[in-house]
Amino acid sequence: MDLWNLSWFLFLDALLVISGLATPENFDVDGGMDQDIFDINEGLGLDLFEGDIRLDRAQIRNSIIGEKYRWPHTIPYVLEDSLEMNAKGVILNAFERYRLKTCIDFKPWAGETNYISVFKGSGCWSSVGNRRVGKQELSIGANCDRIATVQHEFLHALGFWHEQSRSDRDDYVRIMWDRILSGREHNFNTYSDDISDSLNVPYDYTSVMHYSKTAFQNGTEPTIVTRISDFEDVIGQRMDFSDSDLLKLNQLYNCSSSLSFMDSCSFELENVCGMIQSSGDNADWQRVSQVPRGPESDHSNMGQCQGSGFFMHFDSSSVNVGATAVLESRTLYPKRGFQCLQFYLYNSGSESDQLNIYIREYSADNVDGNLTLVEEIKEIPTGSWQLYHVTLKVTKKFRVVFEGRKGSGASLGGLSIDDINLSETRCPHHIWHIRNFTQFIGSPNGTLYSPPFYSSKGYAFQIYLNLAHVTNAGIYFHLISGANDDQLQWPCPWQQATMTLLDQNPDIRQRMSNQRSITTDPFMTTDNGNYFWDRPSKVGTVALFSNGTQFRRGGGYGTSAFITHERLKSRDFIKGDDVYILLTVEDISHLNSTQIQLTPAPSVQDLCSKTTCKNDGVCTVRDGKAECRCQSGEDWWYMGERCEKRGSTRDTIVIAVSSTVAVFALMLIITLVSVYCTRKKYRERMSSNRPNLTPQNQHAF
C-alpha cells in the first residue's frame, strides 16, 4: 500500500487541524519543568565538579592541554544496556550533528584500547578529555536524553570545560556570589590559560557549554548577569553547537572540513557556488534579487540587507510550453551512499510549471554522466517560499541538476530557488509548515494540531503544538487511528519520533535547530491500566479533522518546555512569519540488542608504563615497542628518545650560520696552506734548474 496516497488523507487540505473536542491528557516527560543538566544533577544530590564533570585524582590539578588528552578523529563507543531506548536514539542523532559540522566521527567499539562507555548513571556527566584509562564512562541518565545535553557531555569528553570558567570570564559576565547555593561556589571558579585554552576564540554567550543564568541559584534571582543585557536570556542554550563551539572544536582537532556536509548555496556570490548553465536547454536561470510577480526578496535575508539577497529565477512567462532551463551543481563526491537535498522554492508562474530534480552520475563507462530523474515538483502558487527535501542515494561522482520546465498554463512569473543545502544525512520524513505563526504565540488560540502523517512502518500520527502558555511552547506526539491499524503491532513498539523546530539559517552548518525526541514504550501503562501506546481506536478519544471526518487520538507524549517564547523569536526559527517543524518517526527496536563486547586490544598504557615522555610528549606503540611522539609548533619542536631536547628554527639558523663560517674558515686555511706549499715547491724547482756559474767559466771569457 502507498502510504502517501491513502484516500482519506487526500482531501485534508488544511495545514492546521484543530479539534473541537476535548484534548486527551498529555504526558509531560519533563514534569512541567524546564530543567538544565545542572538542575537534574543537583536534584539527584550529585556534587560533581562544575556540576557535570567527573574528575580523577590525576586531573584535579592538571591541565588537559596537550595532544595526549585528544581522542582520535574516530572515537570508539559502547552504548550500554542500561541506557533508555530513547537515549540510545538521541545519542546516535547527536553523532550525526558532529559529523555534519566537524571532522569528528564515532564508531562502535571494536577492541580499541581507549573508548567511551555511555551508560545510564545517576545524572548527566563526563570526564574532560581522553583520560587514557581504557573504558571511559559518560552518563546519560534519566531526563538527560536531549540532543544538546548529549552534545554538551561529549564536548567535555573531547576536551572542553565550561565557557564561563575561562580566564577572561569576568570581562563578560558578573557572578552574583550571594545568590549561589551554599557549597556550590567552586563551580564558578575560573582557570588560567595553562589549564584551559580558549584557542584565541572570543567569549561566547551562545555556547552550548555555558551555564544558564539560573545555574545553582539559591532563590529566584540569576547567578550570572551578562555585561551586555541582550545576552541575559541567551546564555545556557541547549539547542545545538554555536559557531564558536564549532570553531574551537575544529581548531583543537585540526578539522579542515566536516564529514557529512557537501554543499551550501545562497547565491550571494556571482559565481553561484560553481553551478553551471546547460547548453542544451531553451532558457537560463538568472541570478536576481527580486521578481515583479514575486518573490519580492530572497529567502536568505528576506530583503533586510540592502545590496544583498540573491536567488536563481527561471522566467516561465517569456518562453513556450515545454521550454526548459537547466542549472547543474558543481561536481560532488559522495562517501556514505545517501544524501539529503534541501532547498526553498517559490512559484510565481503557473501551477503547471514544474521543477525536476535530476542526478547526473559519472562512471568510467559514461564520462558524460548518466541522467536520472529523482523528483518532480508541481506547486500551486502560494505567494511564499516553500521548503523541500529530496532524498538521494548516490554512490559515484555526481552533479545535482535543477530543471525548470514551462507548463501549459498561463504564467506571469516563474520558478525561483534559494538556500540550497546538500549533506550526507537522512532527510526528515515530513514537514509541518505553519504560516502566520506569530499570531499564535501566547494566544488562547495557540493550540495547534498538525495534519495527519504516516510513519515508515504505517503508524498514523499527529503533532500537538501548544503556544498558549505565557512563557513556553509545548510539543506532543500523538498516535491516531489510521488505515493500516489492522496490520500493525500493538502496543506500538519502539518508534522514535523526532520533532525539530527548524532554524532557517541559509547554511545548514550554522543552524541551531531545537529538537526533541520521544520513543513509544510498548510496556508503558496509564493510571487505569491501559497500555499508553495501544491502538488509538481502543484507548484514544474521539476527535474531528477540519472537514468533519471523525477519528480517534491517543494520548500525547512530549514536553511543555520545548522552547521558551524568547528563544522562539530568536535566530531564524520564524522567517517571513513561517515556521517549519521537521518530523521523523523511525523504528529503533534494533537498539534493544546488546552491543557486541570484544576483548580489548593490548593496553598501550602497559607497554608505555616504563616510558616517560617529557615536555608533553605522547607515548605510542610502534612495531610492538614504546616510543615517544614529541610535540612541535610552527617554529619549535622537541626531539630525542624521551623528547628531552628542544629545537627551534632560530637554533637551526644559528647552527647553519656557524657551520657555514667554520667551513669557510677551514677552506680558507686549506687554501692558504695550499698556496704556501705550491709557492715553496715552485721556488725549490726554480732553484734546482738555474745554471751553475763558477769562477773558471768566468775566466774562459
UniProtKB/Swiss-Prot annotation:
Catalytic activity: Hydrolysis of proteins, including azocasein, and peptides. Hydrolysis of 5-His-|-Leu-6, 6-Leu-|-Cys-7, 14-Ala-|-Leu-15 and 19-Cys-|-Gly-20 bonds in insulin B chain
Start and end residues of each Peptidase M12A domain: 62-256
Binding site residues for Zn(2+): H152, H156, H162
Cofactor: Zn(2+)
Record flagged with keyword Transmembrane: yes
InterPro entries reported for this sequence: ConA-like_dom_sf (IPR013320), EGF-like_dom (IPR000742), MAM_dom (IPR000998), MATH/TRAF_dom (IPR002083), Meprin (IPR008294), MetalloPept_cat_dom_sf (IPR024079), Peptidase_M12A (IPR001506), Peptidase_Metallo (IPR006026)
Stored SMART domains: MAM, MATH, ZnMc
The entry's keywords: Cell membrane, Disulfide bond, EGF-like domain, Glycoprotein, Hydrolase, Inflammatory response, Membrane, Metal-binding, Metalloprotease, Phosphoprotein, Protease, Secreted, Signal, Transmembrane, Transmembrane helix, Zinc, Zymogen
Cofactor note: Binds 1 zinc ion per subunit.
Entry comment on modification after translation: Phosphorylated by PKC at multiple sites of its cytoplasmic part. Phosphorylation dcreases activity at the cell surface, leading to diminished substrate cleavage.
Glycosylation sites: N218, N254, N370, N421, N436, N445, N547, N592, S593, T594, T599, S603
Ranges for domain EGF-like: 604-644
Cytoplasmic face residues: 674-701
Phosphothreonine: modified positions: T694
PROSITE patterns: ASTACIN, EGF_3, MAM_1, MAM_2, MATH, ZINC_PROTEASE
Propeptide segment residues: 23-61
Quaternary structure and interacting proteins, as annotated: Homotetramer consisting of disulfide-linked beta subunits, or heterotetramer of two alpha and two beta subunits formed by non-covalent association of two disulfide-linked heterodimers. Interacts with MBL2 through its carbohydrate moiety. This interaction may inhibit its catalytic activity. Interacts with TSPAN8.
Protein name stated in the entry: Meprin A subunit beta
Source organism of the structure: Homo sapiens
